[in-house]
């Protein structure tokens, strides 16, 4: 076991994580990583900005807020890259792991651009495609252990 302060700081991005998909986070942490930030549908992007309450049309402000969430379903998706870049610096990230759920095609397509963005900042990147089953836990552990070992 590694002391927490010496573990690589990992940002998890991509699809929502919950239920059995938490196996990715568990695998990262059991293999020596420290997940310090989630930039995914259930993470920072959903709470990053407040709704502008000082407006005559609060419904428009709510709609604007939801339409500006950095999501792979939105094109162009500049807001996701802005948030990701800010989080990489703010949390002093050592590496990024992107979680893609099988059949989530929008995140799968955008992973190419996320990889370019992250590696362009000089950080290691790994993409994990998984599902909600437990059938790939062995493969996840092998990949996460190798990825973290190279950091």
Name each model feature, range by range.
Residues 11-13, 99:
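Short hydrophobic segments within beta-strands
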Residues 16-76, 80-83, 87:
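Redox- and metal-dependent alpha/beta enzyme cores, enriched for Fe-S-associated oxidoreductases
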Residues 2-5, 63-65, 92-95:
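A short alpha-helix capping/helix-coil boundary motif
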Residues 1-7, 17-18:
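Electropositive, gly/pro-rich neighborhoods at or near active sites that engage anionic ligands
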Residues 8-9, 25:
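Small-residue-enriched flexible segments
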Residues 81-151:
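TerminUS-proximal long segments
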Residues 5, 30, 120-122:
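Short, well-ordered coil/turn elements that cap or connect secondary structure elements
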